[in-house]
Design a protein with these regions (language model features):
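Nucleotide-activated chemistry modules centered on ATP-dependent adenylation/adenylyltransferase
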Residues: 1-13, 22-243
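Catalytic cores of secreted/periplasmic lytic hydrolases that degrade extracellular macromolecules
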Residues: 19
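The Walker A (P-loop) glycine that initiates the GxxxxGKT/S ATP-binding motif of P-loop NTPases
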Residues: 16
Length: 243
């Protein structure tokens, strides 16, 4: 509904890690585009560029890195086949912000829960540069993120803090003329997995591969991908995508 109502041509930027939440987010956007294309003659919404932006830290788990590369290639191919304005972009940290320069060259400790320097240097900064380029060119940009309140109490507080009652968009906390939209923020974990398992991937990828990556990353909790949401339940082993 929001995609149909937005009459501007400001680009949409989807943060895509290849994980379950960003996969569901892109799935819903893709299905919305298909519906608009089917139901509307020469829809102006299809003239708005939608960028699927994936950040490559260059130190990802090889299994996940290979999976993400294959997914991105399939997204680009299928978008061109369906003539949808979806474009894949990969960002990388600059040399001075890279993992090995910081750990070996500057003596930084390996990122941990208390000091996750990699998030800013290797993920936020590269993506922010791309967003700034789009804002400079188009005046404004909208970032779509796959964050959910049910992820954690901390995440729920963060979402609530930045929400504006009655508004879909919130101002980006740092970047000017940039707005944030979180379409799946109210989804529970089981709803995310239901979408992944019940709806075929619009770009033609096998979603069972993603399911198995999470399952295999949780050897002592192999049913995690289908767990009924419970606040006392921990995250899925080492299945986090990205830094």
């Amino acid at each position: 509904q929001y995609m149909y109502a937005d009459t501007s041509f400001r680009p949409w930027i989807i943060g895509f890690s290849g994980g379950k939440d960003s996969t569901v987010l892109l799935t819903l956007v893709w299905l919305a585009l298909r519906k608009i294309k089917k139901d509307t003659i020469a829809p102006f919404q299809l003239r708005r560029p939608i960028y699927v932006v994936c950040n490559d830290t260059m130190v990802e788990n090889p299994i996940i890195a290979t999976y993400v590369d294959e997914v991105l290639a399939q997204i680009e191919t299928k978008a061109r086949e369906e003539d949808l304005p979806i474009f894949v972009r990969k960002t990388e940290p600059r040399l001075g912000d890279s993992f090995w320069v910081n750990v070996i060259g500057k003596g930084y400790p390996v990122p941990n829960t208390a000091f996750r320097w990699c998030t800013d240097k290797m993920k936020i900064k590269p993506t922010a540069r791309f967003i700034i380029e789009q804002v400079d060119e188009c005046g404004e940009a909208i970032i779509l993120i796959g964050t959910r309140k049910a992820e954690s109490a901390t995440r729920a507080r963060s979402i609530k803090k930045h929400e504006v009652y009655g508004k879909r968009l919130t101002n980006h906390t740092i970047l000017r003329n940039t707005y944030v939209y979180a379409p799946i923020k109210e989804l529970m974990l089981e709803e995310v997995w239901y979408i992944i398992n019940a709806i075929p991937s619009p770009w033609g990828f096998d979603n069972s591969i993603l399911f198995n990556i999470y399952k295999d990353a949780s050897a002592d909790d192999y049913e995690c991908p289908t767990v009924v949401t419970d606040k006392s339940h921990g995250s899925c082993g080492q299945s986090r995508f990205g830094c």
